[in-house]
Amino acid sequence: MNRSMQLKRMVEDDLRHAIDNDQLMLHYQPQVSVDGSTLVGVEALVRWQHPAHGMIPPSDFIAIAEERGLIVPLSEWVLRRACTEARRWKGIRLAVNVSPIQFRHKDFVANVIRTIEETDFDPAQLELELTEGVLIEDADAAEAAMMDIRAHGVGLALDDFGTGYSSLIYLRRFAFDKIKIDRSFLEYMESTGESAILVHSMAHLGRALGLRVCAEGVETAEQHRFLQAIGCHELQGFLFSKAVPASEIDRLLRLDNPFAEILAAA
């Protein structure tokens, strides 16, 4: 049996046990104001600390969890743990990814609201990140669920913006609060003028529609300066920080200007 098959079998056998026995953990990637002065939010990202195989990245188990029907319990664990840990971080948003399978589950909205209530988390601080895949199967049902979620004060972000076929239609129809420009555009921005033009256009469109604009995958000072000049509101990427444990977010929030040294050295 090759390594990929061994990994898949191990994930199938062990992931349910990991969810039930606290072998998962969350790291949080900071989302920073465009001038780099303020931590405005964090994105919760799951990690798996396997007792025999060490740290397993999400790229090795999320897709398998979707295939094997484990993505709903996994996603519910992530949301509950994130709300529990982030409850102490006042004044910043908590972003949590929602998979298409999770979103289409009949109890999705009820589970989100129950989790918020049971963890005593402020719904105004929660932001659910949706991709185009969440919306394409049943747009009417998706719209109803989104309206219900927003009625409870929870924010919605369109993730991976610019990579799908119908993103502009979704911006017109669905009530998003934020768009996240996909990292793939930033990867080629410095080598191709077309990517820079597209990023500029997406930022302008978001602002014109009254949406917050966040650029993902920011890794260089040149990207930062460009994104600031075109009017992005928020930035996320390795220039500022990789995903870190909750204790590091605690530390960053105690600082007046947590990313000043990073930007000065860039």
Can you say where each PLM-predicted feature lies in the sequence?
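Short, conserved glycine- and acidic-residue-centered signature motifs
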Residues: S75, A142, S195, V199
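The catalytic core of metal-dependent phosphodiesterases that act on cyclic dinucleotides
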Residues: T115-M189, A203-A243
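Short, solvent-exposed loop/turn segments at secondary-structure boundaries
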Residues: Q6, D107, D140, E190-E194
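Bacterial c-di-GMP phosphodiesterase EAL domain
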Residues: R3-F121, G133-V134, M147-D148, L168, ...
